[in-house]
């Protein structure tokens, strides 16, 4: 049995894909373009551009992933699987595949042999610095060949580059949008909080592949520090000069899952909480998933019984919901817009208030009755005011704003209407910060990591703020729906040729489809000529239609596109901290 197992492992270790020639890691049509380009093409220049946005409230794209692409793919992978392999092996592999799946003509290796003999990729990539937010329609990087006659190579690499970079750029852009929302509400409701810890990444299990998970979580970590994806930290260490032993690259929190909670059985659920809090994790942070059976019972029964143990721990207990509508679970289904709160008002004073004060405070539509919902503590009062009938000097009757009688119906607000944060405050108390928002003690909090979309984080934060609850009372987890439910077309990425030298003559080239008139966007139209990328306030814009001579002029000396890769060598090697600070203007 052991020998058979080892034989199988040995067989499966030696796969074709593991050592795939990168010149085969392309779309089929790329293989014939060296034959199809205009004769005597010497140089080609192409630009990578986000042509559009399908993500709400996003009009700028975060540059991220280039350094990893260069190190892992354009340098290491090309060296191992192309330049460092015998040409005979490379050619045989290429011809075997292309001749039998495309055409014999497509399997021509004349240009590939020249490239292999050269020993490096004769291209230059110039890019905006990573962490820069670039306006939609502005080029983010440029690719050109550095050796005459290799113009065909520029766009041959498009597929290989695109598949490795559109996703980290998209994820970094989405994560930044979450951070914008976090910053807005932290500024409004939180004193002394840490916005970078507000959202964790929970996406790995739902991503389409390991590498996709690593990239997406690494992109998330440009704007936040929390992640459940351990390899993302290693990925950033490998490619972005950071060290998790010396700085916060990413961090996790000890957390339970439902198999842990259900292993105690329903009858042993309270013992599960007690054992975890008092015996297993008496110190440090601990997140406990709490909806295995009855989430509300945990909040209103178990936690009050464990209040003393939780309060004396050196660390934070975080209660995690994992089902239902996250907005209602966290904030309560009763919204602040559904009632009014009157400072200092008691139950005994409701009638007197609405007889003498309401007309000065709340709108009335001139009818015989007006209705209000008043919240005092955990009770809701339905107030009906009956207005006086009177007449004017002409004898015409009408209802006045004078209230003759007030009726009140009282009911207790349910635990579902109060929601997680309010229930935790009822057990553990709260303080009111300098901005007037309620804050749980440092040893208790809430977390929710299911279905937290961009729309939902905004709604959760708004409803918290409306109830005068600081948004730092809850941590939110961003999952694979957010980071996987995207495509290259979410931001319209493409690489298009715009400039060339043919037989010694410069030519500006472009794409402008007459049929590209969907909703008047014309988004498939490319730039023309060389591009100068510049900053205008908060915007990163471009000027097109330039020549090589133009680019030498002083007015174009500060092009934001800076060379990062040339002839097989990395030219700029930045660290994670630099990129984070650039993205967040020093306020990561």
Task: Provide a role label for each language-model segment.
Residues 2-57, 61, 94, 106-122, ...:
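Buried, small/hydrophobic-residue-enriched core segments of structured protein domains
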Residues 44-107:
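Low-complexity, highly charged intrinsically disordered N-terminal segments
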Residues 387-392, 399, 486-549, 554, ...:
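Hydrophobic, secondary-structure "cap" segments at the distal end of domains
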Residues 335-343, 403-420, 458, 483-523, ...:
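C-terminal helical cap(s) of enzyme catalytic domains, especially alpha/beta-barrels
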Residues 452-466:
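Catalytic cores of alpha/beta
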Residues 3-63, 67-68, 525-588:
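Extended hydrophobic packing segments that form well-structured cores
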Residues 467-493:
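Glycine-rich phosphate-binding active-site loops on the catalytic face of alpha/beta enzymes
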Residues 285-287, 316-320, 443-447, 473-477:
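Structural preference for beta-strand elements that scaffold enzyme active sites
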């Amino acid at each position: 049995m052991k020998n058979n197992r080892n034989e199988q492992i040995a067989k499966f270790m030696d796969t074709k894909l593991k050592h795939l020639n990168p010149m085969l890691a392309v779309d089929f049509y790329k293989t014939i373009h060296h034959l199809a380009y205009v004769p005597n093409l010497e140089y080609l220049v192409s630009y990578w551009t986000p042509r559009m946005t399908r993500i709400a409230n996003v009009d700028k794209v975060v540059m991220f992933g280039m350094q990893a692409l260069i190190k892992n793919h354009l340098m290491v992978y090309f060296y191992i699987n192309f330049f460092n392999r015998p040409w005979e092996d490379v050619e045989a592999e290429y011809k075997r595949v292309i001749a039998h799946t495309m055409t014999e003509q497509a399997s021509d290796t004349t240009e590939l042999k020249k490239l292999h003999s050269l020993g490096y990729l004769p291209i230059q990539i110039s890019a905006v610095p990573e962490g820069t937010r670039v306006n939609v329609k502005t080029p983010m990087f440029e690719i050109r060949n550095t050796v005459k006659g290799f113009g065909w190579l520029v766009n041959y690499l498009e597929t290989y580059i695109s598949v490795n970079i559109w996703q980290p750029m998209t994820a970094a852009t989405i994560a930044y949008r979450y951070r914008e929302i976090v910053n807005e509400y932290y500024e409004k409701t939180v004193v002394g909080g840490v916005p970078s810890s507000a959202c964790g990444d929970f996406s790995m299990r739902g991503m389409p592949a390991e590498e996709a998970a690593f990239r997406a979580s690494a992109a998330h970590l440009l704007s936040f520090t929390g992640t459940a994806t351990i390899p993302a930290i290693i990925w950033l260490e490998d490619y972005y000069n950071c060290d998790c032993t010396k700085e916060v690259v990413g961090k996790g929190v000890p957390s339970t899952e439902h198999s842990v909670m259900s292993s105690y059985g329903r009858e042993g659920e309270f013992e599960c909480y007690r054992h975890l809090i008092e015996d297993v994790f008496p110190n440090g942070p601990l997140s406990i998933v709490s909806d295995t059976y009855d989430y509300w019972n945990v909040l209103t029964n178990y936690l009050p019984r464990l209040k003393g143990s939780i309060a004396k721990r050196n660390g934070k207990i975080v209660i995690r919901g994992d089902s239902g509508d996250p907005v209602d679970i966290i904030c309560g289904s009763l919204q602040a817009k559904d009632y009014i709160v009157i400072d200092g008002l008691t139950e005994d004073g409701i009638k007197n208030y609405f007889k003498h004060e309401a007309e000065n405070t709340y709108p009335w539509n001139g009818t015989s009755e007006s209705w209000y919902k008043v919240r005092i503590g955990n009770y809701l009062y339905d107030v009906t005011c009956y207005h006086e009938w009177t007449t004017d000097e002409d004898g015409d009757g009408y209802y006045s704003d004078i209230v003759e009688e007030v009726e009140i119906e009282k009911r207790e607000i349910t635990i579902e209407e109060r929601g997680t944060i309010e229930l935790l405050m009822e057990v553990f108390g709260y303080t009111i910060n300098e901005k007037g928002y309620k804050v749980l003690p440092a040893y208790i909090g809430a977390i929710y990591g299911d279905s937290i979309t961009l729309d939902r984080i905004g709604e959760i934060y708004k409803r918290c703020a409306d109830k005068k609850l600081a948004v730092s009372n809850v941590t939110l987890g961003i999952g694979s729906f957010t980071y996987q439910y995207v495509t290259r077309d979410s931001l319209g990425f493409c690489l298009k040729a715009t400039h060339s030298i043919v037989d010694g003559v410069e030519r500006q080239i472009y794409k402008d489809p007459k049929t590209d008139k969907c909703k008047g966007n014309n988004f498939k139209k490319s730039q023309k000529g060389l591009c100068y990328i510049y900053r205008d306030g908060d915007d990163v814009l471009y000027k097109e239609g330039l020549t090589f001579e133009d680019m030498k002029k002083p007015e174009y000396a500060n092009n934001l596109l800076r060379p990062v890769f040339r002839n097989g060598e990395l030219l700029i090697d930045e660290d994670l901290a630099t990129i984070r600070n650039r993205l967040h203007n020093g306020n990561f």
